């Protein structure tokens, strides 16, 4: 299941984007999570740890998409980010935070879905070889061939890998483990 997170402070625009993504459910297993506030998104991202694609509105009242992206990059420097906005004036800023693409509103379904599907294809290839889990510093990602073994004691998971030993709270079945 791919997790796509959207953040736009306009409920109407959020509904349009979610509607476009609903079309993907016929082809791919996607979970769509939406936020109307960047601060709420950051709070949940710190707790839950990851998503496969992040779609951010550039201009939001509480915290703009670029600010949200900067904070996300401190937690996860690999998550693909799509920026959507009504103006192209800040396109360069979007690319400074490593945005994959910049899409101008009103968002055309075909353009948006094309970008999302390209990212999902990339993520699917990555998933075959990466194990990710939440950590204090954000999301930790390890190559599966670097993992020696996993241990579970109630809800505490211990990962012993080439890079070191890591622990997180959860269950192995809820994580994307091995292909």
Regions found by a protein language model. Give the residues of each.
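Two-component/phosphorelay signaling modules centered on CheY-like receiver
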Residues: 11-33, 74
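CheY-like receiver
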Residues: 27, 43-126
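Conserved Asp/Asn-Gly motif in the active-site loop of CheY-like receiver
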Residues: 32-40
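Conserved binding/recognition cores within well-folded domains
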Residues: 114-179
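Conserved sequence signature across two-component system core domains
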Residues: 7-8, 35, 54
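Acidic di-acidic motifs
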Residues: 8-10, 86
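Non-catalytic signal-transmission and effector/linker regions of two-component phosphorelay proteins
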Residues: 1-5
């Amino acid at each position: 299941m791919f997790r796509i997170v959207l953040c736009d402070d306009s409920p109407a625009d959020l509904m349009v984007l979610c509607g476009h993504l609903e079309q993907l459910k016929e082809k791919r297993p996607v979970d769509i999570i939406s936020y109307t506030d960047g601060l709420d998104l950051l709070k949940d991202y710190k707790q839950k740890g990851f998503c496969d694609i992040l779609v951010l509105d550039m201009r939001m009242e509480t915290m703009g998409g670029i600010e949200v992206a900067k904070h996300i990059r401190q937690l996860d420097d690999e998550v693909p980010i799509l920026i959507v906005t009504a103006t192209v004036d800040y396109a360069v800023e979007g690319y400074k935070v490593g945005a994959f693409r910049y899409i101008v509103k009103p968002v055309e379904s075909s353009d948006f879905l094309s970008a999302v599907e390209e990212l999902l294809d990339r993520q699917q290839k990555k998933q075959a070889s990466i194990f990710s889990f939440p950590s204090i510093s954000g999301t930790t990602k390890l190559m599966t061939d670097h993992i020696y073994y996993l241990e579970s004691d109630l809800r505490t998971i211990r990962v012993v890998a080439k890079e070191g030993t890591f622990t997180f709270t959860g269950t192995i079945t809820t994580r994307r483990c091995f292909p």
